[in-house]
Each structure stands twice: as structure tokens, then as C-alpha cells.
């Protein structure tokens, strides 16, 4: 989840969460423009990968764009979408911390329904809370699904992209440490190097981040200084996304609605900016399309202080991939193109 942190840990974004009715959650939204006839570009089978998407989808307004881009990416064999919790910030926002994962689950259902897919991906409940400590899993459908897929006799590379806290992947690892050499973690999160500090996705489960960083699992980290560069404007989204099917209209409308609400809620803060947004989750998709081999460094792993969230040295031979650049236009234009191809404007 892209988080433009405005003034440190005390200032944070707030998502407007309106629970869906049972009818809204279960009704398939048919549209005259559908993805059922979508003919994606050909991708050699040997280049395809297996993928789980872990997302705090109702936290604000950008996860939805990354979900749609990933689903429309022919390189990806999507094995499931996992709704992740954001209970720590829900508590600070005086919201029901028990409900963050469920709200996200309903949002994923809505997005997938509006896409009108011939074969929708599986959707899994994630953990309702952050893990209690670095040794105890929060067992969930999502964590168990990751383990089951990872332990299959399948040589196709398996990735888990975490657009929010990394709770469910950490829980999967704690349930079955053998998955460490079978899964690559791609995480949108963590503060800027070298110091680090408070960052939204990290704040929602620092213990989970430490579990994965300390493990033998390969990690690709896209920290805040990089993911925040995925800038677009509401005008560009209106022009390139809104005309394309019910899903395009929804992506635009839900962002406008959240922008209006958050701007009125926090009139003295410099977020939202009013006419622009950073689609900070989408790099999790684009680095799997193209690794940006000159945009990262393999560096010694650090872990996170549980109180101030700064980076701490960790005695280990492990190195992780840390991105210092992801191409914003490649990332965004790929999404725009796929939406336009799948849902031609009338």
C-alpha cells in the first residue's frame, strides 16, 4: 500500500471503509465491456511464474490498481489473492481492528467481480492481526494456501507480492520453514535507507517483516523512497482508466471518493495533494515483468527496531535485493495498456 507519510509515526493515512452488503459481495457485475474475450500478448511458457497477491485492499485507494494489473498480466499464473490485515493502524484510527481484513476481503471480491473474468482467481482470508512475536504464526487461509502451493512438485518460480504488511507470508514460513527456498518475497514497504523509520506497511506488522528478513527466503524490497515515485494524476486516470469498463469506472470513482474524504478529514496535512496520487503498490508487478537489473543492489540484510522502526544490523550472510529505482512510466503505462486492451472504451 503506497503510504505518503506526512509527519512521522503520529501522522498516518486513514481509509474510508464502507462495508458491502451481502448482495454487493456476491453479485457478479456484468458489463457490455468484459475481459472474457481479452486476448493477452503471448508469453513463452518458460517465462511464466506462479504468484500470490497479498493486499490490504481497503486501506486507501491504490491496491486496487495493482490487483487489476496483476490479474491482467499473462506472465502471471495467479494462485490466489490474500486479504491482509491492517489492524495496528485501525486501532489508531479508532476503527474496529477486528474488521480490517474482512473489509479488504470484501473489496477484493468487488474488484474481481467488476473485472467480469471468465476464470476468477481464488480469494483467501488472511490473518486478522499482526503476528504476536517472531515465533508464532497467525494461521489463516492465505498462509495455508501459500504453504500448500510452495510444497508442490512444481519447478515454476513462485513469488508472493505483499502490498501491505507481510503477515501472511511470515505466518506461512512459521508454519512450514521449508518454503524459504521455494518462494521469493516481493515487499512494498520499509523506510528509506540507511536509517529507516516509521512506514505504514512496516508499522502494521514489524515482527512479520523481521521473520522474513531473518529467514533464508529471497527478498526483493521496494522501500518508500522508490514506491512513492509512481506518480499519476486524477486527470490521467480519468482519461486512461475510467472509460474502460465497470472496473475502470470503479477504479477512478473510488479514488476520487477517497481523495475527497481524506482531504476533508485532514485539511491541514499535505496529503492527499488534491489532484495527484502515487500508485505505490504497482512496482510489485513491474519488477516481476522486468527485474530492473540496474535499479537494485544486493545488500546485507538489516532488521527492524520494534519501537522506532529504524534499520538495525543483523549478523547474517544473507543479502536481499533492495530497489533504488523502478521505472514509473513502464509500470503505469503497462497497467493503462492492459486495462484498455481488456476493456475497450465504447
Question: How does the language model describe each region?
Answer:
Residues 23-346:
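N-terminal acidic, glycine/proline-rich low-complexity segments
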Residues 9-17:
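Bacterial N-terminal signal peptides
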Residues 1-8:
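Bacterial N-terminal signal peptides that target proteins for export
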